[in-house]
């Protein structure tokens, strides 16, 4: 699915096959990765009772709007704003404890 923090198109992987979730793990991937890389991790933690959410940073994988790997001048500020937006989305939708990994 896509979320739109500050009109940026950010792809979000959501692995939610949990009947009675204990919490949500929000993954913040590294600079040379994407959220999909954590699929096996997500399936493991789904079996343990956790929903797993990992977005693609702006300019990465499915969040590319212009050039792949493009990092705007204030790129790290943008990443931080996007992650906070996603954390707030998780709080609003799931109302469960969140562990942030990354």
Where in this protein do the model-derived segments appear?
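Proline/glycine-enriched tight loop/beta-turn segments at coil->beta junctions
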Residues: 16-24, 50
């Amino acid at each position: 699915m896509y979320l739109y923090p500050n009109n940026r198109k950010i792809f979000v992987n959501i692995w939610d096959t949990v009947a009675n979730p204990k919490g949500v793990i929000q993954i913040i991937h590294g600079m040379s990765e994407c959220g999909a890389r954590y699929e096996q991790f997500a399936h493991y933690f789904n079996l343990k009772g956790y929903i797993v959410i990992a977005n693609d940073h702006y300019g990465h994988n499915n969040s590319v709007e212009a050039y792949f790997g493009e990092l705007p001048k204030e790129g790290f500020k943008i990443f931080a704003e996007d992650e906070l937006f996603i954390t707030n989305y998780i709080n609003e939708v799931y109302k469960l404890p969140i562990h942030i990994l990354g």
